[in-house]
Amino acid sequence: LYASESYLQRRPNPNRLSSLEQDDFIGWSEAQQHLQSAQWLEKTLRGRACRLTTSTMSAQFSAVQAGIGMAVLPHFIAQKMGLICLQDNIGCDQPIWLVIHSDLAHSRRNRVVADFLNELVAKEHERLLMP
């Protein structure tokens, strides 16, 4: 769960994370409700609406950076962007998928890129898991 410094400075309960009832959240649009992070928000907010819903991860990052609210974001990206982690283990692990169209799976160029990405993820596995 991440927020920007500007959001934290104006949040209703600056020193209490036990209660998120008055906080603003950036959530997912209807089409992304299958995501673990969307389901966590649904359970946490108990029917309360998000301040903003988006359909892309990049929009969520931009909204958090702008101080609009908090969002469930991947650690390995959010930390590089200078966002502040409020809760590091909320049980929303998301797999990383590499998808290649079946017609292109045997193309030498695509295979080289796919192999490189697989090696990179394997090499950075621990860092991708860490909060």
Label the model's feature ranges.
Residues 2-96, 123-131:
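C-terminal regulatory
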